[in-house]
């Protein structure tokens, strides 16, 4: 099943539903590398040519719709549940920073990067949204990894200074506040820089909602009532939580009668 919704910048996006079985697969990626984990999550975004800010907002909404609208945050009172809407409100809307430059008759449009920083310094070239030479236009986000490397290797060396200037000029737009400091609960302020590896790490963290052991335990319990395992693993985690609550309530009533 596919879901569609509109981002704050009015762009329509399409995503694949994140199912219970996908969370088990995600746990395997999550425990290996950041690269594998973030690429796995990106695979659920059907809409092409998004920048990482749009991907971030898309994944927040996907998480809300398929896993739940709350995430646990450490505080002096233990784990506190925070609404994802609270995070989205803190972040607000991202300013349009698109800028066009020309180097050696090559027109380049600069914008938020289309690749996350997962340790590969070449990601910085994804600040280039498109390249136009004569009548040929190349959309950088649409390129495969090999095509991307081939294109950036042919760029004039002067592009480095332009990218550096662009980053410095828009520094404030690359920084977002996910959580504001809340002294009563001893919740620390969490700031993210979209150009830093902490940005994709935060995204991976909010999808970290179940362990492999918990996955098997939930299946074992629910299979006592729903014998069709395929139905369960092809449900969302949000639905699984509802099924589990119904089963628990039913069991309590049976024990009381």
Predicted stretch roles:
Residues 1-257:
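An amphipathic, hydrophobic-aromatic interaction surface with interspersed Lys/Arg
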